[in-house]
């Protein structure tokens, strides 16, 4: 069977489960947003990788999110492949822009959920500057 998307899926690579949950959290805090399109190539830290000085407040949110994920990777309890931030699923609720991580999450899921929650709330508090989307990474992120 062949699946065809009219939404430009060829532009968006398949996303691990946790990143899809992070996407949903951003949609909760910023209704009407398209996180996979808007944030995957923003500044120096939003999307894959990250280096240099963040270009603005939104990019700082992404750097803090990256740093948060780095902390969970250092926790020996969360070092198995099932617990890495990009694939570990967690439970949370969204109500009118408010995000709550479930008390039922295990230690690793709780940490990852809180990383994503903090970043999604941060995104909602800072401006999105179109000029920092798809910047020249090599020259501006040193």
UniProtKB/Swiss-Prot annotation:
Alphabetized InterPro entries for the sequence: PLipase_A2 (IPR001211), PLipase_A2_Asp_AS (IPR033112), PLipase_A2_dom (IPR016090), PLipase_A2_dom_sf (IPR036444), PLipase_A2_His_AS (IPR033113)
Cofactor: Ca(2+)
Tissues in which the protein is found: Expressed by the venom gland.
Regions crossing the membrane: none
Keywords in alphabetical order: Calcium, Disulfide bond, Hydrolase, Lipid degradation, Lipid metabolism, Metal-binding, Secreted, Signal
Domain of life: Eukaryota
GO BP terms: arachidonate secretion; fatty acid biosynthetic process; lipid catabolic process; phospholipid metabolic process; positive regulation of fibroblast proliferation
EC number: 3.1.1.4
Note on cofactor: Binds 1 Ca(2+) ion.
Cysteines engaged in disulfide bonds, as pairs: 28-94, 44-141, 46-62, 61-122, 68-115, 78-108, 101-113
Location relative to the cell: Secreted
GO molecular function: calcium ion binding; calcium-dependent phospholipase A2 activity; phospholipid binding; signaling receptor binding
Catalytic reaction list: a 1,2-diacyl-sn-glycero-3-phosphocholine + H2O = a 1-acyl-sn-glycero-3-phosphocholine + a fatty acid + H(+)
Cellular component terms (Gene Ontology): extracellular region
Similarity field: Belongs to the phospholipase A2 family. Group I subfamily. D49 sub-subfamily.
Protein name, per record: Acidic phospholipase A2 KBf-grIB
Classification lineage: Eukaryota, Metazoa, Chordata, Craniata, Vertebrata
């Amino acid at each position: 069977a062949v699946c065809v998307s009219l939404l430009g899926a060829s532009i968006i690579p398949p996303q691990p489960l946790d990143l899809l949950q992070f996407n949903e959290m951003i949609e909760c805090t910023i209704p009407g947003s398209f996180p996979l399109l808007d944030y995957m190539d923003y500044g120096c830290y939003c999307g894959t990788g990250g280096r240099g000085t963040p270009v603005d407040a939104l990019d700082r949110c992404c750097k803090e999110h990256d740093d948060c994920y780095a902390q969970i990777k250092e926790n020996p309890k969360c070092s198995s492949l099932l617990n890495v931030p990009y694939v570990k699923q967690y439970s949370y609720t969204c109500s009118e822009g408010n995000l709550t991580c479930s008390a039922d999450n295990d230690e690793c899921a709780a940490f990852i959920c809180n990383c994503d929650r903090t970043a999604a709330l941060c995104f909602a508090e800072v401006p999105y500057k179109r000029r920092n989307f798809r910047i020249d990474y090599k020259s501006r992120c040193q």
